[in-house]
UniProtKB/Swiss-Prot annotation:
CC terms in the record's Gene Ontology section: alveolar lamellar body; cytosol; extracellular space; lysosome
Cited InterPro entries: Papain-like_cys_pep_sf, Pept_asp_AS, Pept_cys_AS, Pept_his_AS, Peptidase_C1A, Peptidase_C1A_C, Peptidase_C1A_papain-like, Prot_inhib_I29
Active site (UniProt): 141, 281, 301
Reactions the enzyme catalyzes: Hydrolysis of proteins, acting as an aminopeptidase (notably, cleaving Arg-|-Xaa bonds) as well as an endopeptidase
Name of protein: Pro-cathepsin H
GO MF annotations in UniProt: aminopeptidase activity; cysteine-type endopeptidase activator activity involved in apoptotic process; cysteine-type endopeptidase activity; cysteine-type peptidase activity; endopeptidase activity; HLA-A specific activating MHC class I receptor activity; serine-type endopeptidase activity; thyroid hormone binding
CDD domains: Peptidase_C1A
Keyword terms, alphabetized: Disulfide bond, Glycoprotein, Hydrolase, Lysosome, Protease, Signal, Thiol protease, Zymogen
Amino acid sequence: MWAVLPLLCAGAWLLGAPACGAAELAANSLEKFHFQSWMVQHQKKYSSEEYYHRLQAFASNLREINAHNARNHTFKMGLNQFSDMSFDELKRKYLWSEPQNCSATKSNYLRGTGPYPPSMDWRKKGNFVTPVKNQGSCGSCWTFSTTGALESAVAIATGKLPFLAEQQLVDCAQNFNNHGCQGGLPSQAFEYIRYNKGIMGEDTYPYRGQDGDCKYQPSKAIAFVKDVANITLNDEEAMVEAVALHNPVSFAFEVTADFMMYRKGIYSSTSCHKTPDKVNHAVLAVGYGEEKGIPYWIVKNSWGPNWGMKGYFLIERGKNMCGLAACASFPIPLV
């Protein structure tokens, strides 16, 4: 079936159909080659009908990648596991479908006046950050941001790095205005863990990537929250202090189409908003730095280690890029 697709396009061209010009046919032939190589790499198989749909999405993404990388941007795009998807599909499967406006969150973090170190990376300070995880086709990014921050907080306080149960938050944290695979906020998840008196480990409450019934067992809780530090809305300097002096910080931001194919470099965008009502993805700031005069955050994502920079990305710091300073928080562990 695969070899038939260019012939179908060629037939349409011979019949005078406008959909397939000669130049487009040549491009599609090359894109098909790249797509089939990508399919082997990612172990993808499709029905004949889906193959054509995925090929078109892949070709569109590949053109966008090449056009973007030919221009003068601070970050590069590249093929990844999402390359056969449209951005609309990514939004449905991986981002929040339930709006999460954190503007009503009451801040309680009072920052000092600095100065702060010019750079920080908790990954290099010791065994304080768990490996990059993969949320799968579930808008549960907020649970990974939550566990990532608390895992680090416990490790910094005790020297022991736990692996915590995202699935418990998916299944059990609804009473704190979280919505499982439809979205949630780390600040609200920290409050759930605090009042629930604990969270289990991922070994005893494994991740399934779908909504389920709550199976929390208090006797198996391994991490606890004493309090939650909510950083003042849009106070990015307070985020710097928190990461420098205390802990990796959970935050949310708005993902737009140009982020989907991020490969490396310092991400910035003119297509996203800076307001708290537009954020749709939660992540974890594990450090910060500056490159060629551009300050950035070092951010742990939850799309697996093969996305971006081994599962991480850099995003421009100091401009509330895509609303990243709207929903920042971190837990104070009870140890």
